[in-house]
UniProtKB/Swiss-Prot annotation:
Locations listed in the record: Cytoplasm
Name recorded for this polypeptide: Signal recognition particle 9 kDa protein
Gene3D superfamilies linked to this entry: Signal recognition particle alu RNA binding heterodimer, srp9/1
InterPro entries for this protein: Signal_recog_particle_SRP9/14, SRP9, SRP9-like, SRP9_dom
Gene coding for it: SRP9
GO molecular function, one term: 7S RNA binding
Subunit structure: Heterodimer with SRP14; binds RNA as heterodimer. Component of a signal recognition particle complex that consists of a 7SL RNA molecule of 300 nucleotides and six protein subunits: SRP72, SRP68, SRP54, SRP19, SRP14 and SRP9.
Gene Ontology cellular-component terms listed: cytosol; signal recognition particle receptor complex; signal recognition particle, endoplasmic reticulum targeting
Originating species: Homo sapiens
N6-acetyllysine found at: K52
GO biological process, one term: SRP-dependent cotranslational protein targeting to membrane
């Protein structure tokens, strides 16, 4: 289970993992108040990518990452619907 030290590396690897098989990929966001740590996991049951942070500025990056994944999901669904109707 590789734990990434930089956000850029993690986000690139997580996006690749999602694009490899969107139906198997999951994203888990976990916050521990006692430690003040935020943990993001992206997995497809074979590979598990982890990024942990205690910096408030990383929350914006994580929010942007989630919206990027949502856009990828919607774009993929829209393509599937148009292919089914044709």
């Amino acid at each position: 289970m590789p734990q990434y030290q930089t956000w850029e590396e993690f986000s690139r690897a997580a996006e690749k993992l999602y694009l490899a098989d969107p139906m198997k990929a999951r994203v888990v966001l976990k916050y521990r108040h006692s430690d003040g740590n935020l943990c993001v996991k992206v997995t497809d049951d074979l590979v598990c990518l982890v990024y942990k942070t205690d910096q408030a500025q990383d929350v914006k990056k994580i929010e942007k990452f989630h919206s990027q994944l949502m856009r990828l999901m919607v774009a993929k669904e829209a393509r599937n619907v148009t292919m089914e109707t044709e």
